[in-house]
């Protein structure tokens, strides 16, 4: 009986060392050597080298000279009241909930007031509430507003949108999307 206890204790210790120490260390080293950008959060820096965000997490843009992101039920976990570990999630409001309808109507009105034709992803938040992309159609809907605010030639703005449009994953999965943060940084750096 003692022998079985010692064997099980050794097995537990060995598995713990393998799964809690050795395996994570190997994954960490491989990640840092093979995929350092992704392993460190896909961080994006500005022209001064300051980190301004992640390519994987959206941000709120409200100024006229910027492309606007999707609405976020959690406000992209920004601000003083944001959880330090970050949060994600949708509003979980039912389609019949009047609060959801009010939010969508207010967003549609804001877009129309700014001469932007509402598209689905400019009206509805994503499931995670952190989506960094808008559709190419949503970028085109904001084209005139941004071009006017920045006094940028249309062909130059169209070129920037095209450059920052990411295709389907492996050519077949998902939909093309425009990363709003990288597009807005490109506008600032032009």
From Swiss-Prot:
It comes from the Bacteria. InterPro entries: KdpC. The keyword Cell inner membrane applies. GO terms for biological process: potassium ion transmembrane transport. It is a single-pass membrane protein. The system is composed of three essential subunits: KdpA, KdpB and KdpC. Keywords: ATP-binding, Cell inner membrane, Cell membrane, Ion transport, Membrane, Nucleotide-binding, Potassium, Potassium transport, Transmembrane, Transmembrane helix, Transport. One of its GO terms (cellular component) is plasma membrane. The chain crosses the membrane at residues 15-35. It is found in: Cell inner membrane. One of its GO terms (molecular function) is P-type potassium transmembrane transporter activity. Belongs to the KdpC family. Part of the high-affinity ATP-driven potassium transport (or Kdp) system, which catalyzes the hydrolysis of ATP coupled with the electrogenic transport of potassium into the cytoplasm. This subunit acts as a catalytic chaperone that increases the ATP-binding affinity of the ATP-hydrolyzing subunit KdpB by the formation of a transient KdpB/KdpC/ATP ternary complex. NCBIfam families: kdpC, PRK00315.1, PRK14003.1. This is Potassium-transporting ATPase KdpC subunit. Pfam families: KdpC (PF02669). The gene is kdpC. Coiled coil: none annotated.
